[in-house]
Amino acid sequence: MNGDNSVESGGAYSAGLLSQVNDSEKMVNNTRLETTDKTNIVTSGENAVGVLACSSPGESRTCVDAVDDEVSDSNSYEVISRADLKMNGGSITTNGINSYGAYANGKKAYINLDYVALETVADGSYAVAIRQGNIDIKNSSITTTGTKAPIAKIYNGGELFFPMSPRYQNKIKEYQLMHQISILKPK
C-alpha cells in the first residue's frame, strides 16, 4: 500500500489489515502486506484487530481466536509459510472491547511496526498480542486507556522485540521471569 491511506472496520472480529496463510505442507505460500507511507487504521468492533498476521495457528483454531491459555493448538504438518505484515508510519486505534492493536498468531506470523502510534481505548484490550508469532516495534508509541488493558499479552512461545531504555530493563526482566515470556531487543 503506497501513499496516505485510511482503513476503518466496524464489525466484531474484524481486522484493519490482515496477512494470512494456511499451510498445506506441500509448497511455500508466503503472504506479505506492507505500507510504505502514512496509513491510519481504526477499528470499532468487539474483538477486532488493527493489524493481524496469521500463519497456521493450529488445526482447532482460527486466525481471530483470542490469545488464551489453550496449549493444544498444534498442526499435524510442519508450518512452512510466513505471514508478514510491515507498517511504516501511521497509526492504529482500536475502540472495541477485548480488541488487539497488533496480533501475531501462529509460529511464522511476523509484524513489524516502525513510526506507528498504537492506541487501544476500550476495556480488556491489548496494544500487542502474540501467540507463537513475532512482533518488532521501533520508533513507535504505545498507549492503552481502558480498564484491564495491558500493553502486551504474549503466550505459547511468542517474541516481542523493541528498544528498551536502561530505566525499564529491570522491570521487563522481572516481568519476563514472572510470566515466562521472551522480550528481546531488536537485532
Per-segment meaning from a language model:
Residues 1-48, 52-124, 129-148, 153-172, ...:
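Surface-exposed loop/turn motifs in large extracellular/passenger domains
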